[in-house]
Amino acid sequence: MSKHERHNAIRELIAQRPIASQDELRRKLVRRGFDVTQATLSRDIHELRIYKGPGGYALPNGNGHDEQDDLPDVDEVMSSFGLKVKQAQNQLVLVTTAGSAQPVALAIDHEDWPEVVGTLAGDDTVLIICPDQKRATVLAERLEKIIG
């Protein structure tokens, strides 16, 4: 089946009922005849701008449209999913709960903070690149306050 068909199936499954994990979503896709790996599903989730909130995975605006007002709030996702921040010169490594790095990185990216050049999200880790060490320290302190 095509990528387009898989994306439609993902949207439909998430709209139908709460999905708590990527593995649960992957199993539901397999039952529908899609041969999908965790890596492919991770890319699909990123491309569809799906985020993981307290109730499970959700589509932006509930229908897959990309509208900034419907993105998760950085304070909400950081306090829910952020665990710790480690600084390495001008870079920060933000450790999150499993499966939560994508929505955290998305929320940080959309804050448009001058301390952030860009983010790179894995499954439970976000790499944040800052322009210099001083701004990395400022951002680390801000994120640690949000995490609590």
Curated annotation (Swiss-Prot):
GO MF annotation list: arginine binding; DNA binding; DNA-binding transcription factor activity
Pfam families: Arg_repressor (PF01316), Arg_repressor_C (PF02863)
Main location: cytoplasm
Lineage of source species: Bacteria, Pseudomonadati, Acidobacteriota, Terriglobia, Terriglobales
Keywords (A to Z) from UniProt: Amino-acid biosynthesis, Arginine biosynthesis, Cytoplasm, DNA-binding, Repressor, Transcription, Transcription regulation
Subcellular location: Cytoplasm
Pathway(s) annotated for this protein in UniProt: Amino-acid biosynthesis; L-arginine biosynthesis [regulation]
A GO cellular-component term linked to this record: cytoplasm
Organism: Acidobacterium capsulatum (strain ATCC 51196 / DSM 11244 / BCRC 80197 / JCM 7670 / NBRC 15755 / NCIMB 13165 / 161)
SUPFAM superfamilies: C-terminal domain of arginine repressor, Winged helix' DNA-binding domain
Function statement: Regulates arginine biosynthesis genes.
Family, per entry: Belongs to the ArgR family.
Protein name as annotated: Arginine repressor
BP term (GO), one: protein complex oligomerization
InterPro entries xrefs: Arg_repress, Arg_repress_C, Arg_repress_C_sf, Arg_repress_DNA-bd, WH-like_DNA-bd_sf, WH_DNA-bd_sf
